[in-house]
Amino acid sequence: MFCIQCEQTIRTPAGNGCSYSQGMCGKLAETSDLQDLLIYVLQGVSAYAVKAREFDIIDHEIDTFVPKAFFATLTNVNFDDARLVEYVEQANAYRGRLQDAYETACTAKGVTPEQMSAPAQLILATSKPEMITQAAQAAPNRGDVHEDILGLRLLCLYGLKGAAAYMEHARVLSQTNDEVAGQFHEIMAFLGEDSVDVDKLFATSMEIGQLNYKVMAMLDEGETESFGHPEPTQVNTVAVKGKAILVSGHDMVDLELILKQTEGKGINVFTHGEMLPALAYPEFKKYPHLVGNYGSAWQNQQKEFANFPGAVVMTSNCIIDPNVGSYADRIFTRSIVGWPGVTHLVGDDFTPVIEKALALDGFIYDEIPHLITIGFARNALMAAAPAVIDNVKNGSIKHFFLVGGCDGDKAERSYFTDIATQAPDDSVILTLGCGKYKFNKLEFGDINGIPRLLDIGQCNDSYSAIQLAIALSEAFECEINELPLSIVLSWFEQKAIVVLLTLLSLGVKNIRTGPTPPAFLTPNLLKILEDKFGLRNTTTVEEDLKTILNVA
């Protein structure tokens, strides 16, 4: 086992990364090894997908499968070895299918098939124990490679994982694109070649950022076409009397299915975590039994799910051990999510969830409502832009802070609460992702009717923030980096990595990240990123605010 992809990975003077028998996320060594093998086989699939495309052979089923299966290897997504073995075997079958198609096309054209990369040539083991042994050749730190090269490879690999997750979210909303899929395969295949070319690896990281910008646009289009444009909405965040289902993850389509299937059954539906933004979409306001948001970010689920008196559905990341809070018998997984012993739902029938919710007590009384305001996504931001611009011009708004990303449980993450609460009263705070839960229930007031706290949405709604920044830069006839805008990104896993790469690929500079730098980035790489982009780690709130606001 070697895993260094998330913020909670082990860091010691002897070296960084989770190894031995179990990772800090709870992932067992065998599970980690199977994920490595899955990635390796997927790189082989992509290698053949690239070659097949040279003959105009595009297999949409495979284009769908590869990013979805890759998504299963993100932090806190799939811990179920049996499901991972199925993914590995399916990937191997798809690789064989593309290989046959490619070689047949070569024969028809009278050309010799090219020599393929090691992942494309792998002869897959036939049993789980043999696969785990075989996984050694698929480990991300395989071979004798300089730590800077390894760090760049991992930056690309983990960034592409984040993009794969967003591709799957977009696909669920019927948003696919052959060009995007082709570019994804090219990068995936390249990473399977174990390049030692620093310039090529760095350029690839920027290419991943550009790819993800396209994917976020697709996802934005899919969500708004399906559910309308989010609009400023007040949301209740406490218990409502009645039977209950809690929906966590990111999948709006699953939420819609659950709402339709629970109509008239006396069940209240709550969102959790990154599903909170759903409550701002017009289409979801048709359902009076979608009553609010319960709980906070992913790392608190073992307490929050244990206290929730109903059924829980995990539509995507993040899941952590449900046995700790003794709710494994009433949590259900969907799509790429998996935990051993937890009921996994295949297809669109949520009857088991409904039956479980009806059998449980539900909330026995209403709590006094606590309302927060959400829904400041792209359309709402664009509508507010003229008023925002006027307030900047008249001096009422002097600075913008974008504070968001992934949440986590380290004590140092109080930084993100403090920078939001200590930001000057003449500043506006934009937030997105589950990092918002560090401060989204606090009161920030308004500036001439413009709320000081604007909740943009999910982590992928970084796209909305980028559109606002572009609109402001055009209005003020300046570059984005010349705007009074400071980005403070809380990172935990691979989606945050690809959002960062997206911003860097667009030329956005002087971003602060925290609470700690990614362990896979060496001091040399961090210095390069600082020199090239002004990327830096958070320090103290007081020092960072002085620097941001140019206070002597």
From Swiss-Prot:
Keywords: 2Fe-2S, Cytoplasm, Iron, Iron-sulfur, Metal-binding, Oxidoreductase
Tagged with keyword Cytoplasm: yes
Top-level lineage group: Bacteria
Biological process terms in GO annotation: response to hydrogen peroxide
Catalytic activity of the protein: A + NH4(+) + H2O = hydroxylamine + AH2 + H(+)
Binding site for [2Fe-2S] cluster: 3, 6, 18, 25
Example of a GO cellular component annotation carried by this entry: cytoplasm
Gene Ontology terms, MF aspect: 2 iron, 2 sulfur cluster binding; hydroxylamine reductase activity; metal ion binding; peroxidase activity
EC main group: oxidoreductase
CDD domains per UniProt: HCP
Enzyme Commission code(s) on record: 1.7.99.1
Bilayer-crossing regions: none
Family annotation (InterPro entries): HCP/CODH, Hydroxylam_reduct, Prismane-like_a/b-sand, Prismane-like_sf, Prismane_a-bundle
Pfam families in UniProt: Prismane
Residues annotated to bind hybrid [4Fe-2O-2S] cluster: 250, 274, 318, 406, 434, 459, 493, 495
Cell location: Cytoplasm
Positions carrying Cysteine persulfide: 406
Record text on cofactor binding: Binds 1 [2Fe-2S] cluster.
Signal peptide span: none
Cofactor(s) this protein requires: [2Fe-2S] cluster; hybrid [4Fe-2O-2S] cluster
Purpose of the protein: Catalyzes the reduction of hydroxylamine to form NH(3) and H(2)O.
Family listed: Belongs to the HCP family.
Protein name in the entry: Hydroxylamine reductase
Organism: Shewanella sediminis (strain HAW-EB3)
